[in-house]
Amino acid sequence: MTVTVTPIDLGFDRCYVLQGDGVIVIDGGAPKKGAAFRRGLERAGVRPQDVKLIVLTHGHWDHIGSAGEIKAITGAPLALHEREVSWLEQSLTPLPPGVTPYGRMFIKIHGWFMPLIKVPAAKVDMPLGDEDVLLTDYGIPGRIVYTPGHSSGSVSVLLDSGEAFVGDLAMNKVPLRLSPGLPIFAESPPAVIRSWESLLERGATTIYPAHGNPFSADVMRRAIEDLSRTPTSVWLQERT
């Protein structure tokens, strides 16, 4: 089965509309982006009522901000890992720590503006666990897989054809990164690496980040190989 992928920019990041025998949406963008989402659906030739599931890769504000609006537009249920359900249902806006010096500076500055950001609360209909969730019932040949690291409840969508929609497990957009690679923010850098090892072992070939354009999984494979030669790297050390 061929799956058509349509990105829709919702602020600084994007959501993805996947069309197979059914339609799902991945991520909910920044707040107040419902109109942009509706326009994107129209460009993709998708009727709102055709969307059967909204998968949120994690609970940070720029991925859940318009989740409630998208749910209202489509009538589709929201899926989010159980560890982060409260973030959406209680309008919480935690930020992950920076991994690199630049990441730490970026997140510090970002934090100054967080009091201005309001995430509308929305009910999560499908709390996800750590086990895979097949998407065949929604007409998509693939699965939701647990890929913690950027946050403790991060998930990815991995299609049988190798396309991986990873949220912020990778980044490919200025000013976050100049080129595709590992995220500059993460709750657990070693967990990020383990999640990448799992995705690559399971056949990921093309990576679709929430920030930036898709790129080859070989980029991540080389990044992990390089880190394996630097055992003192922060990416391999748990925070204390």
Report each predicted region and the residues it spans.
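Short acidic-hydrophobic surface loop/beta-edge motif
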Residues: 8, 18, 132-138
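Residue-level marker for buried hydrophobic side chains located in beta-strands
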Residues: 24-26, 55, 78, 163-165, ...
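Binuclear metal-ion centers of metallo-dependent hydrolases, dominated by the metallo-beta-lactamase
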Residues: 215-240
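Conserved beta-strand hairpin/beta-sheet module of binuclear metal-dependent hydrolase folds
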Residues: 1-44, 156-172
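Short, acidic/turn-prone active-site loops that include or flank metal/cofactor-
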Residues: 30-31, 83-86, 170-171, 232
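Metallo-beta-lactamase
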Residues: 31-32, 118-125, 132, 141-218
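Active-site HxH/HxHxD metal-binding segment of metal-dependent hydrolases
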Residues: 42-127, 233
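A general structural detector for well-ordered alpha-helical segments in enzyme core domains, enriched
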Residues: 37-40, 66, 195, 223
